[in-house]
């Protein structure tokens, strides 16, 4: 069975289910582009979602239902995305063939490309059409998602009266919303830092060429601060984001920041090095940060210093319209980084 990772039609409500919070985004498509109708989030109890696995589907479902109710969202068609160990995204190089032949090849030969039993996964693919007159081979993006994990999400959403018509991958969702805002000519590393995972998607020539999920996230930093000073999680979170003054704790917090964020930077550098080794003539233009972890105080400057590249926070709503009486533009900008994946799902058309 295939899932519609690469499909196009009517818009859905984007639902980003992370380990820390659920984010929701609803857009409207017009002749002038997209308009933001609704955005919102709700924090989940710790452990309700872990590395993409729904440990407490009833609790997560209740949180989503309450969020839809509070935002007065009437649409029942939604999309969600997955990441972590349950999904494999791999680029394979194959001989050029007709679409039906390519599908047949992928479905019969997939086990040589993915580490899962073929019976246990949903598969989808996209021909990137990289062949030329001189080269009769093409790159194909292959996605395999564990049925057990995906089915848990589908069942949870169905139980609260929602119909999932889009199943996306975090990296693709990020790519969707980024490409709406920025010309495709750039070579960019999209880095989304969530509470428990970091997604890296390097785009070159309008195509994903490096995609990685790494099990590190901003919760690490919060927990280190919490344990160091024996304080509540919320206070540690404020110190991490710089919304609470560090005062006499400044030096210790900087040391924690250096320890944890150096690990993040090493993972980002690995992906960049891989990109450069395969694309020596196409230097990376910049790094674009998203996710709640992207707002960690000092991270943008630290990453600039360590990589020598321009680094910026991503605002997926920069080129979208909104009802200023309902949603303040400054608010949209402030929550933009953590709403990137939800908006990337919402920008995706449905197939049903």
What does each model-found stretch correspond to?
Residues 1-109, 151-153, 159, 163:
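Non-catalytic, solvent-exposed interaction/assembly segments
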Residues 11-15, 187-191, 288:
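Conserved beta-strand elements of the Class I
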Residues 19, 25-36, 80, 135-235:
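Small-residue (GG/TT-enriched) beta-loop-alpha framework at ligand/catalytic clefts
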Residues 64-77, 160, 231, 269-286:
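Phosphate/pyrophosphate-binding loops at sites that engage ATP/ADP/AMP, CoA/4′-phosphopantetheine
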Residues 72, 152, 194-205, 333-352:
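Extended, charge-rich low-complexity interaction segments
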Residues 81-180, 286, 316-323, 338-341, ...:
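Active-site neighborhood for divalent-cation/phosphate handling
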Residues 227, 238-286, 293:
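Adenine-nucleotide phosphate-binding core of ATP-dependent small-molecule kinases
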Residues 260, 282-318:
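Glycine-rich phosphate-binding loops at beta-strand->alpha-helix junctions
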């Amino acid at each position: 069975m295939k899932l519609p990772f690469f499909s196009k039609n009517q818009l859905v409500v984007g639902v980003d289910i992370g380990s820390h919070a659920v984010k929701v985004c609803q857009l409207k498509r017009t002749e002038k582009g997209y308009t933001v109708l609704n955005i919102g989030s709700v924090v989940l109890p710790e452990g309700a979602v872990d590395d993409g696995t729904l440990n407490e589907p009833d609790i997560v479902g209740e949180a989503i239902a309450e969020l839809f109710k509070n935002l007065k969202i009437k649409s029942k068609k939604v999309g969600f995305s997955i990441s972590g160990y349950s999904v494999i995204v791999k680029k394979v190089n194959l001989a050029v063939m007709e679409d039906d032949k390519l599908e047949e090849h992928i479905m019969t030969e997939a086990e040589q490309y993915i580490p899962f039993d073929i019976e246990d996964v949903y598969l989808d693919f996209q021909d990137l059409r990289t062949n030329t007159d001189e080269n009769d081979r093409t790159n194909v993006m292959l996605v395999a998602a564990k049925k057990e994990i995906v089915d848990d999400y589908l069942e949870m959403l169905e139980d609260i009266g929602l119909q999932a018509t889009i199943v996306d991958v975090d990296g693709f969702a990020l790519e969707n919303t980024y490409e709406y805002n920025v010309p495709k000519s750039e070579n960019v590393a999209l880095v989304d830092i969530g509470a428990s995972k970091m997604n890296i998607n390097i785009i070159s020539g309008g195509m994903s060429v490096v995609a990685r999920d790494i099990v590190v996230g901003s919760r690490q930093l919060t927990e280190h601060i919490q344990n160091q000073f024996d304080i509540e999680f919320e206070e540690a979170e404020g110190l991490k984001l710089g919304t609470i003054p560090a005062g006499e704790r400044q030096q210790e917090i900087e040391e924690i920041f250096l320890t944890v964020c150096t690990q993040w930077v090493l993972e980002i550098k690995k992906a960049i090095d891989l990109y450069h080794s395969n694309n020596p003539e196409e230097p990376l233009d910049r790094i674009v940060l998203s996710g709640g972890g992207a707002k960690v105080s000092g991270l943008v400057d630290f990453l600039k210093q360590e990589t020598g590249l321009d680094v910026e926070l991503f605002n997926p709503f920069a080129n979208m319209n909104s009802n200023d009486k309902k949603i303040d533009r400054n608010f949209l900008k402030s929550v933009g980084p953590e709403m990137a994946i939800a908006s990337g799902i919402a920008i995706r058309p449905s197939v049903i």
